[in-house]
Structure formats: C-alpha cells, structure tokens
C-alpha cells in the first residue's frame, strides 16, 4: 500500500452540499464542494488543494461550488513583492510591540472568551456568538494538517502587560502560509489588529522562505472580504490559473474596515 503522503488527489472523492444561505452576500444561496475522506488530507495533499482554491473549516476541506455565482475568488499575496501602503505602515507601527507566541492548536479559556466577545460585537446575530466550547474547538482547533495558533499580547512593561489582544490560526503549506481565522479585542477603539495580523503573517512567510500568503476568498461585493485587495500584489485563481489582480476598490483608495480573516 502506498504511503499516505504519496496518495494522489485521485484517491479523494468530492461531493456538493445542499444549498444554504450565503453568509457573505445577502439574499443569495451557496453550495460547497467538500473533499473526502478527511483522514487522507495530510499537509502535502492539503497544500495542493489550497492551490486549487480549497479552504478548511476544522477537518472539513471545501471550496465554493455555487450554482449561479462565482463571487468567491481564491487569493494570495506575493510576499516578496509586497510593500505596505501608508495605512498598513501605521498599523505596523502601532502594534509591532505586541508579543506573538506561536503554539500548537490548544484550547485556552481566555481565547474562547475573546472569541465570544469578538463574535458578539462584530458578528452579532450570526449564530457564532452563541458557539459552545465544542463548536469553537471543532471550528478552530481541529486539524489534520500542519496548523498553528498564534496569540498576541501586550508586552511586558506596558500598562496592560500580558493582556490578550488577538488570536490567529494559520496552516503551514509547502508554498506558503494560509490564514484560517483571526479574532481580536473589539473594545480597543482605533486599533488595526486585523491589518497588523496579515502584515505579521506576510513577514513570517518571508522568514520561512515561502512565496505565498493565502487569504481565502476575495469577494468584491462583500465589505468584510473586499479588504484583501489592499494587500498588493495579489494573485487570484481563475479557472486553473493564478494571475496578478488589482481590484477597483483598492485602486481607488476606498477605505475598508479592519480585516478579520474568515
């Protein structure tokens, strides 16, 4: 029998979900294509799936498979060519003192409390603000690939030394990092934690000598997803080809909310 890491993508099966309400574009229905079985999707296979436009939620690996909509566009930053704009430089300057700790995916009560606070203030009524501990763990702490949790805290000597400000989940691929999900303290007015988190991940990707930071799906008509076009140069996947893309919103310099990767 072949070693697990040698199994080709042809060993996987793909099925389409039933239609469900789209969480990004109001009034639309969505479907996903899910890769199975989950136990065959190791780090190598998952890297190849991400390059084909897939993401994961817990142990479920999926990509958009909608009947009449193609709004969700896989995107990735070319980290070696990335240069921050003025607002991104300001976000870096404001938050570079945060202490980052990279750890395995582990349940921490403090993280869960921040997650609920973030959901209640940023996505109230969406259902995730009522997530149980089990739902939180299934969503963010279950993975069969090379995943990490990163927590950001106020540094020693600061007025709130040790205070948790942000938690981010990332996957390590063979050609880059993939941002899974980020949540942060929503009570700090004027903070740019989400922007800083992406900048931090870009730097980490560079330090690993890898070319890409995958940001999930860019959706032009979704305000909470359109921000991704601010990180240039951005590549998008169309058909089976990645190509450089500059979104109209980014080109016009329109402001966007601080990101939270989803």
Curated annotation (Swiss-Prot):
GO cellular component, one term: cytoplasm
EC top class named in words: transferase
Reaction(s) this enzyme catalyzes, per UniProt: N-terminal L-glutamyl-[protein] + L-leucyl-tRNA(Leu) = N-terminal L-leucyl-L-glutamyl-[protein] + tRNA(Leu) + H(+); N-terminal L-aspartyl-[protein] + L-leucyl-tRNA(Leu) = N-terminal L-leucyl-L-aspartyl-[protein] + tRNA(Leu) + H(+)
Enzyme Commission number(s) of this protein: 2.3.2.29
GO molecular function terms noted in the UniProt entry: arginyl-tRNA--protein transferase activity; leucyl-tRNA--protein transferase activity
Top-level taxon in the UniProt lineage: Bacteria
Cell compartments where the protein resides: Cytoplasm
Keywords: Acyltransferase, Cytoplasm, Transferase
HAMAP family in UniProt: Bpt (MF_00689)
Family named by the database record: Belongs to the R-transferase family. Bpt subfamily.
Name used for this protein in its record: Aspartate/glutamate leucyltransferase
Name of encoding gene: bpt
